[in-house]
Every structure is written in structure tokens, then in C-alpha cells.
Amino acid sequence: MSAAQGWDRNRRRGGGAAGGGGGGSGAGGGSGGNGGRGTGQLNRFVQLSGRPHLPGKKKIRWDPVRRRFIQSCPIIRIPNRFLRGHRPPPARSGHRCVADNTNLYVFGGYNPDYDESGGPDNEDYPLFRELWRYHFATGVWHQMGTDGYMPRELASMSLVLHGNNLLVFGGTGIPFGESNGNDVHVCNVKYKRWALLSCRGKKPSRIYGQAMAIINGSLYVFGGTTGYIYSTDLHKLDLNTREWTQLKPNNLSCDLPEERYRHEIAHDGQRIYILGGGTSWTAYSLNKIHAYNLETNAWEEIATKPHEKIGFPAARRCHSCVQIKNDVFICGGYNGEVILGDIWKLNLQTFQWVKLPATMPEPVYFHCAAVTPAGCMYIHGGVVNIHENKRTGSLFKIWLVVPSLLELAWEKLLAAFPNLANLSRTQLLHLGLTQGLIERLK
């Protein structure tokens, strides 16, 4: 089965730096609080220290983790653990990630440090032309071997997950702005195959740093930069007809959002909300946000409500954003002066900002983030030091909702039986595991 066939099956049912990329938005249901159940996951920091179990005599390399204590911080630092012959992704920025119930997928990225980028082994230096998978149940990184043409625009592209398919659009190669993309590439993660999505209509310009989301069966792309000109264009790709359309809102030019890149978007099915972003010399405020109304084909400006004690989140670009139902979470980013390490929540019904008590162990920008359907956010990579131009390969996770009893029991089971993934399906069924949980082990 080809990647394109896999896609069809799912279908039927001035420039700024590109060396970083906040992850795309995710959506998923999580259980709310219930008598305090599982609330300890939300207000304490836990260090993961279990080693993966291996049968036989294969050696395990275990990199010790720096112990971090942050008051009221529910962030978990995930250590590097991998088999001989397997390595975690090198430090990077400008990459993107998405998540499902089972894996975190990390694509692309940039690191100008020759040694950190893999040295002579990396033919695409300073970019990373690679797709990684982090398996939640075993805590193991794996670089995926794929067939087909993997795109070469590997910094500040857009990435979304649609069924079993990764959809990649735009991005830039090296030098930034000189080799941008405007194609949609599809990778079926089940069959590990890349394909170019054949589309009709006039495609968007070759850009990077844009934001992208799937809404009601269409792919929406907003903003970005050519490397010289910043954009406020809004395009729509109908995933059924595969036809591009540039939307022309019913607004005066003075009522349009400012041109920008490295912003994020959220949506409620009726409106697309633009969060932050900027240019190489500015970052836009979050006090007021622009929203595109899909029904009226017009931009609206919405005044958000500040935190009663702290006020509004700082203006930022190169941050990350994930979404759980009507709650949108932004973290990290850069405001033009300092790297940010805060996490904020915006409710799309009340437009009230709430600052989470958690603080990122490493303030970071040009990172990526994704949320699982259960409500756990994973944050990977990014730039952690402006003056030294230093990047990280750290991976963190934080529960944004109170975990369900199933998720709490699942994490306890994995911690108690680290060799669970080595058992056969028949053995796992005899142990009483459901098919859904068994799929998360494989």
C-alpha cells in the first residue's frame, strides 16, 4: 500500500531566522478533576529513572539526568535511554512534532554546531533530514527509516497529524529564505512512506514560519515569510478535492493582522485564532488577538482578559502551542529580549488568560511541542542560550489535565513491568490488557 493510498483512506473517512520551530496545535480529550483523583500529577515534579528492560545480554547505555526541583511544577524530565546502535535525536531547533496515543513524531530541525549535528555523518548539515519516533510506553527513541522522497525544507515547516499521516508544508533549507517550499508532503507512519500530495489551484508562496491546522476537512495556512517579506495571507486546501484557495477576507487592509512568522494558531471550528508571532525585530502582543471567522469570511479583533494578579502573558514569537478542546496552552518563546519559560492557558469561550504554576526547567524558543489525546504535552529541543547560540535535545512532559484513572494505572503498570512490550499479543491478552493498550505497546 502506498503512502498516497494510505492518505486516500484517511481522506475518505525579511526574513526571520528559521532555526527553530514551535510545535503545532494538538487536540484531545482529557478527563477533568474528580474528587482530587490524580491531581498529584499536576503539582509536583517527577524524575523518571527507570531503565528499559532488555532480554539477553544486550547492553544499555544510561545517561544520568540532572535532578531538578521546581516548586509546584508538574513537568517531568525524560532521560535519554536507548540501546546500543540507537541514539536520541541530537540537539536542534526549527523542528516540528506531533503526537498520538503511542508515539511522539519529530521531524527536521537545524543546528549549526558541526559536532552536535552529527559531523561527517550528517550529509544535510546543518539541517536534519530525518524523522524520529519516541515511544511513550518504552521511553525509547528510534530514527525511522522511510521510503519515498523526504522533503529538504527542514526548518520552520508546518506539521500536522491526520489519521496515520504526517502532513508537512513549507519550510526552508539553507541559506534561510533561499530554498523555501510550498508543497504538501505526506508520510504514512504505519507504512513509513513519503509521497507528494498532488494539488490543484494556486499554491501559497514558498514560505517558512507559517502556522497550519486542519479544520472541518480543510488545511488552513496563515502567515509566514519568504525570508524577505512577511505575510498575512490565508490559504485553504480542501483535503477532499485537493484544491488550494487563497481566502480574501471582507476587511479593509488596516483591519488585517500584522504580517508575521513563528506564530501559532488555535481554532474552535468557527474561528481561527492567531497567537503571537512577529518579525526578526518584533514580537506581537497577546493582549488582543485576531480571529478569522470562517462563516463571515472576516477578521475580528478580540480583547483577552488578563490574569488578575500577573496581567497578560508577554509578547512572544517562536513559542509553542497545543490545544485541548477549548483550552489553548502556549509555552516558551522569545520576546526580543529574553527567552521565556512560562506556560499560559487561554480559554476560547471566555478569553481568560491563566498562568500555570509550572515553569519550564529550560526556558526555550524555536522548540516543538505536541499533546496526546489524553492531555499530556511533550516539549522537545529548542534554543536555550541566545549569546552562545546553544540548543538542547531535552524532552519533557507535563500533564495539562488531570489524568484519567486509565492513564494513571497505565503509567503505574509500565513502571512496575518495564518488559511488558516484549511480551506477545497472546500473553498480553491473557494478562487482561485491552486491544487498545496492547496497540500502545507495539
From Swiss-Prot:
The modification Omega-N-methylarginine is found at residue 13. SMART domains: Kelch. GO terms for cellular component: Cul2-RING ubiquitin ligase complex; cytoplasm; nucleoplasm. Kelch repeats lie at residues 87-154, 155-198, 199-260, 261-319, 320-364, 365-403. SUPFAM superfamilies: Kelch motif (SSF117281), NHL repeat (SSF101898). The keyword Nucleus applies. The keyword Repeat applies. One of its GO terms (molecular function) is ubiquitin-like ligase-substrate adaptor activity. Transmembrane segments: none annotated. Keywords: Cytoplasm, Kelch repeat, Methylation, Nucleus, Repeat, Ubl conjugation pathway. Its main location: nucleus. Component of a CRL2 E3 ubiquitin-protein ligase complex, also named ECS (Elongin BC-CUL2/5-SOCS-box protein) complex, composed of CUL2, Elongin BC (ELOB and ELOC), RBX1 and substrate-specific adapter KLHDC10. Interacts (via the 6 Kelch repeats) with PPP5C. Belongs to the KLHDC10 family. Substrate-recognition component of a Cul2-RING (CRL2) E3 ubiquitin-protein ligase complex of the DesCEND (destruction via C-end degrons) pathway, which recognizes a C-degron located at the extreme C-terminus of target proteins, leading to their ubiquitination and degradation. The C-degron recognized by the DesCEND pathway is usually a motif of less than ten residues and can be present in full-length proteins, truncated proteins or proteolytically cleaved forms. This is Kelch domain-containing protein 10.
